[in-house]
Amino acid sequence: IALAHQPLPPTPRVIELEKPVNLGDAPQSYTTLNELFNDPVLFVLKRVAGLEPTPVLTAEEDNRLLGILAHRVFEKLFAHADALTLTNAQAVGWFRTEADALLLTEGAVLLMQGAGVSQQHFRKVCESAIGSLLDHLRSAGATQLQTEVDLSGTLGAVPLIGKIDLLVTLGDKRTVALDMKWRGDNFYASLLRLGEHLQLALYSSLIEQTSGAAP
């Protein structure tokens, strides 16, 4: 029996639901709010339908993988109580000692054939970033560092959670929230200048709700 060709129906740009989606009372984060505001279809697929992308990283996902590994480098470095007393050379020496073990346990795809350029790029950028960040922390008078700080609060009536990459306490007890990104352009600097860095704004609100003073 010959079947006539039937083209697939066109995909609509907008899908209207018959009734509002119940989001429940689960705490929201910057990631979920950013999806809700800027990509609501993705938000519904992930947060309502429960669909999740694979957690497996491939060698092609350079920025995502390198960013995760760089976060781990600074988390491990600042886990040392004397991190702020290290010279740049000492800190870079520590990284060179630890890098191989980190790649073996958490970044094995960078050890695969063909990933040598990405691996060397990762090492070079981390060494430069370690020295640069330590210079900034010293000049600011940093006295205490906390990594991966979990905070909770509210945004209006919505429960809000966040995890700050690096929370710095200065000599005058003021705090600074740092969010580390792996990209070399001016995208995030532009957001800061324009007052549009939503992630840091949310973190600032959470810190103020927790400590009583904005960073």
Label each residue range with its predicted role.
Residues 142-211:
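Non-catalytic protein-protein interaction segments used by genome-maintenance enzymes to assemble
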Residues 34, 45-49, 71-78, 127-130, ...:
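Short, well-ordered alpha-helical packing segments
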Residues 25, 33-41, 58-69, 91, ...:
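Secondary-structure capping and boundary motifs in well-ordered enzyme cores
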Residues 18, 22-31, 50-60, 76, ...:
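Glycine- and acidic
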Residues 14, 39-51, 100-101, 168, ...:
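Active-site-adjacent bridging/hinge elements
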Residues 214-215:
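Short glycine-/polar-rich loops that comprise or flank the Walker A/P-loop
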Residues 72-150, 154:
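A non-catalytic, helix-rich entry segment at domain boundaries
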Residues 1-78:
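C-terminal, charged and often intrinsically disordered regions of DNA end-processing helicases
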